[in-house]
Regions:
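Contiguous, non-catalytic segments that form substrate-binding/exosite surfaces or channel walls
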Residues: 34, 38-167, 350, 354-358
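C-terminal, non-catalytic "cap/extension" segments appended to globular domains
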Residues: 52-69, 87-90, 94, 264-363
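Inter-helical turn/loop segments and adjacent helix faces that build the functional surface
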Residues: 57-60, 125-128, 192-201, 221-235, ...
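Short pre-active-site segment immediately N-terminal to the catalytic Zn-binding motif
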Residues: 163-182
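Short beta-alpha connecting loops at secondary-structure transitions
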Residues: 167-168, 198-205, 270-275
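Post-HEXXH active-site segment of zinc metalloproteases
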Residues: 179-180, 191-216
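An active-site-proximal "capping" alpha-helix that borders the catalytic cofactor pocket
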Residues: 185, 208-223, 286
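Long, amphipathic alpha-helical stalk/connector segments used for oligomerization, subunit docking
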Residues: 219-293
Length: 363
C-alpha cells in the first residue's frame, strides 16, 4: 500500500503551475494545503513556498467574513452545543471511563488482511463506497509509508486535480490503525460523492459538519470488526483511545462557552484562537453526530445512510445549524442533546474495555 510517487510528483507540478497563475481564489485553501502537505510529506518540501505567497493575500479576505459567520453560529447554537458537550463528559464520567492506551497489547495483523476487511466492509455499506475505496488503492492514492507523530492520518484533496490522497501515519499493523484508515477513506468518499460533484468549495473555516462522514465510517467500521468478532480486543482498545479526544473536544466546547459567559467580546478573540476552537467544534460535532448515526445504523441502516446523504448534500446551506441535524433524526430534541440516545452504546463499549483489562470502577 503505497503511493505512485512519480504520478504524485506530476500531479503536484500541475497543481503548482495552476496556483502560480493566480487561479486559486475559489480553490483556497484545499488545493494550496494539498500542495503544501503532499510536498512536505512526500516530496521533501519541494514547492512549499506556495503557501507563503498566498497565505496573507488570500486568507485575510476569506477569514473576516467566515470569522463573523462562525462567531454568530457559536452564539446561536450555544444551548445545543454546551448541553451536548456537558452530556458527553457526564456520560463518560458516570460509566468509569479511564483513558488507558493499550496498543502494545494488540496482536499484529497482516496489511493485506486489514485492507481486505476494509473493502468487505465498504461493500457492505454500498457499492459506490466500495468502488471509491478500491479505486483509491488501485490508483496508488493511499500510503502508510510516511510518519508524522502529530497526526494519525490525513486526507488531502484537490478540486483542480479532482483527486484525494490518503496518508496513514501510524502504519497498518492492527485493526486500530485500520479504523484510522477508514476515517481518512471516509473523507475521500465525502469528496468524491459530495464535495466534488456538488461544487462544495470549502472556506478557510470548516462548516460544523465536515467531520461527520469521516467519523461515521470510522465508527461503523469499528462496529463491523467488533460484531463479526474479527478482532474484538483491538476495537475495545481503539474505542478507549478515541474516546479521549472526544472528551477533550467536549471540554474545549465547554471552555469556550465559559469564556463567552465571562464578558466575551467578539473583538477580543484572535483569528488563530478562533481557528483552534473551530477545529475542536468541528471534531466534537463530527464525533457526536456520527455516534448517533452509528447507533441508528445498527437499527436502521437505510435511514442512517439517508440522513448522512442529507447532511453531506446540504451542509453548505445549513452549515452551522444544529437544529436542522436534529430534525433529520426525528428524535426528541432533549434525547439528542442530552446524549440519551447514545448513552447505552457508550456504556457498553466502556464496560467491554474495563472487563477485558480488569479495570475496577474504584480507580
Amino acid at each position: 500500500m503505497d503511493f505512485d510517487v512519480k504520478q504524485i510528483k506530476r500531479d503536484m507540478d500541475r497543481l503548482y503551475e495552476f496556483l502560480e497563475k493566480g487561479n486559486n481564489s475559489l480553490m483556497y485553501p484545499t488545493d494550496v494545503n494539498t500542495l503544501e502537505n503532499m510536498s512536505a510529506n512526500i516530496l521533501g518540501g519541494v514547492k512549499s513556498s506556495i503557501e507563503s505567497k498566498y497565505k496573507y493575500s488570500k486568507v485575510k479576505d476569506i477569514n473576516k467574513k467566515n470569522e463573523d459567520k462562525l462567531l454568530r453560529a457559536l452564539e446561536d447554537n450555544q444551548v445545543y452545543l454546551n448541553t451536548m458537550a456537558s452530556s458527553i463528559t457526564d456520560i463518560y464520567d458516570s460509566c468509569d471511563y479511564i483513558y488507558m492506551p493499550m496498543d502494545d497489547a494488540l496482536e499484529c495483523k497482516s496489511k493485506s488482511d486489514i485492507i481486505c476487511t476494509l473493502l468487505e466492509f465498504m461493500k457492505s455499506v454500498s457499492d459506490r463506497d466500495y468502488e471509491i475505496t478500491k479505486s483509491m488503492f488501485r490508483n496508488g492514492l493511499v500510503s502508510d509509508e510516511f510518519y508524522n507523530p502529530m497526526y494519525g492520518g490525513v486526507c488531502n484533496w484537490s478540486y483542480y486535480l479532482q483527486k484525494c490522497y490518503v496518508l496513514l501515519f501510524t502504519g497498518l499493523s492492527h485493526y486500530g490503525n485500520g479504523c484510522i484508515l477508514s476515517h481518512e477513506i471516509g473523507h475521500a468518499i465525502d469528496f468524491y460523492k459530495y464535495a466534488l460533484p456538488y461544487g462544495q468549495i470549502k472556506p478557510y473555516y470548516k462548516c460544523f459538519f465536515d467531520e461527520v462522514p469521516s467519523t461515521f465510517y470510522e465508527r461503523i467500521f469499528l462496529d463491523y470488526i467488533k460484531d463479526k468478532k474479527i478482532d474484538e480486543k483491538a476495537i475495545d482498545v481503539y474505542f478507549n483511545r478515541r474516546s479521549f479526544p472526544f472528551i477533550c473536544y467536549a471540554d474545549d466546547v465547554i471552555d469556550f462557552y465559559d469564556y463567552m459567559s465571562e464578558g466575551y467580546d467578539n473583538g477580543n478573540i484572535k483569528s488563530e484562537e478562533l481557528y483552534n476552537y473551530n477545529d475542536s467544534f468541528n471534531y466534537f460535532i463530527g464525533y457526536y453526530v456520527s455516534l448517533h448515526l452509528a447507533v441508528l445504523y445498527r437499527k436502521d441502516k437505510k435511514k442512517a445512510l439517508e440522513i448522512l446523504d442529507e447532511i453531506c448534500s446540504n451542509r453548505l446551506y445549513f452549515d452551522y445549524d444544529i437544529g436542522q441535524i436534529i430534525d433529520y433524526f426525528k428524535i426528541d430534541i432533549d434525547s439528542f442533546i442530552d446524549g440519551d440516545y447514545v448513552e447505552p452504546y457508550i456504556r457498553k463499549r466502556v464496560l467491554d474495555f474495563n472487563k477485558r483489562f480488569n479495570i475496577s470502577s474504584t480507580l
